[in-house]
């Protein structure tokens, strides 16, 4: 919410995930500086994290702030599902002396940023050229599984907010049926997020151990990735392959649901760390493996987002739209990413 429109700059921006919070100052339109990443577990509340950030960067008076957050938003009270923070938006605004404090879903923020991402921060994984006036889909595994989209609206774009990561996982082969049974016995409902997340990667590895009659080594996600990428552990490598395959199926479903011929974007913190493995993985095959609709999906480009802080421009755009003296958001030009580039261009 906001009260009035005092000092316009700098503006405080945030992107809060389940594990880390990234904060920055926008000192002029599109100029984002002083980016810091803070560990959520170090701070009792969001307010404490914000105060520490402002102290570290020596920020002068800040009046307006917006934060993308990895959580559903419904009213003033926020209880984070993947973090211990629980807070009132209005109470936090007052405590920090802000005139404006907006919260939006983190993947809505990332969706708003998609048309603003430079080509050098995207790596194309298959498909053709994007259609300029078609929807854009966004999916990304991290601490959880974020899903969003941009749809054409009034000469610009409108972001869709939802909880698509919690849709039901459907296995596609016997091995995946075994994984579903393993997860279902422990959790009941098996969502895509249950498997397509950091903890999901560990769960996949444990399930494979159980299916093979091996001891369930409780490996952390980073250990599964490292052993799989190095080839030191065949079961870890299979877990990575299945992870990419399941992500391909989920991304293909999303593309069909939205008609996302403008492209499907992969965000989140996990896939960029898979280096060239992702390009050679079953992802693209499973993305297109939709029977009669396979040819439709074969033309849709997939872009891996390689930017270190991709959501912050979207947070800035949301805040700018809120503060601008007009009723409708300013149109955003359609992205025109040319065909080319590979997942080998990515960086961690």
From Swiss-Prot:
UniProt key word Transferase: yes
Q: Which residues bind ATP?
A: 14-19
> What's one GO BP annotation on this UniProt entry?
glycolytic process
One Pfam match = Glucokinase
Q: Name one GO molecular function term.
A: glucokinase activity
> What's the superkingdom here?
Bacteria
Q: What class of enzyme is it?
A: transferase
* SUPFAM superfamilies listed in its UniProt record: Actin-like ATPase domain (SSF53067)
Region Disordered, as annotated, extends over 327-348
Q: Which UniProt keywords apply?
A: ATP-binding, Cytoplasm, Glycolysis, Kinase, Nucleotide-binding, Transferase
The EC number of this protein is: 2.7.1.2
Family of this protein: Belongs to the bacterial glucokinase family.
Name assigned to this protein: Glucokinase
Q: Which organism is it from?
A: Chromobacterium violaceum (strain ATCC 12472 / DSM 30191 / JCM 1249 / CCUG 213 / NBRC 12614 / NCIMB 9131 / NCTC 9757 / MK)
Query: Corresponding gene?
Result: glk
């Amino acid at each position: 919410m906001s009260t009035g429109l005092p000092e316009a700059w700098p503006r405080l921006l945030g992107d809060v995930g389940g594990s880390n919070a990234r904060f920055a100052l926008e000192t002029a339109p599109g100029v984002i500086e002083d980016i810091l990443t803070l560990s959520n577990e170090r701070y009792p509340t969001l307010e404490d994290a914000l105060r520490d950030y402002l102290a570290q960067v020596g920020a002068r008076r800040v009046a307006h702030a917006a934060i993308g957050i990895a959580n559903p938003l419904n009213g003033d009270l926020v209880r984070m599902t993947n973090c211990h923070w629980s807070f009132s938006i209005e109470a936090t605004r007052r405590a920090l002396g802000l005139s404006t404090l907006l919260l939006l879903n983190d993947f809505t923020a990332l969706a708003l940023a998609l048309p603003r991402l430079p080509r050098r921060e995207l790596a194309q994984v298959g498909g053709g050229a994007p259609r300029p006036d078609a929807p854009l889909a966004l999916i990304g595994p991290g601490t959880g599984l974020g899903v969003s989209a941009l749809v054409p609206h009034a000469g610009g774009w409108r972001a869709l907010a939802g909880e698509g990561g919690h849709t039901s996982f459907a296995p596609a082969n016997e091995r995946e049926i075994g994984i579903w049974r393993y997860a279902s016995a422990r959790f009941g409902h098996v969502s895509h997020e249950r498997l397509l997340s950091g903890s999901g990667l560990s769960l996949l590895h444990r399930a494979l151990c159980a299916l093979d009659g091996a001891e369930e080594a409780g490996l952390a996600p980073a250990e599964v990735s490292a052993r799989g990428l190095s080839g030191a552990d065949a079961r870890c490598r299979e877990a990575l392959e299945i992870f990419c395959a399941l992500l391909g199926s989920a991304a293909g479903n999303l593309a069909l649901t939205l008609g996302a011929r403008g492209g499907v974007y992969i965000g989140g913190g996990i896939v960029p760390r898979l280096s060239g493995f992702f390009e050679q993985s079953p992802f693209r095959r499973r993305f297109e493996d939709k029977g009669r609709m396979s040819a439709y999906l074969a033309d849709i480009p997939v872009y891996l987002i390689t930017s270190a802080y991709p959501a912050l421009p979207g947070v800035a755009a949301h805040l700018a739209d809120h503060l601008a003296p007009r009723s409708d958001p300013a149109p955003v030009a359609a992205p025109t990413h040319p065909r080319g580039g590979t997942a080998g261009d990515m960086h961690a």
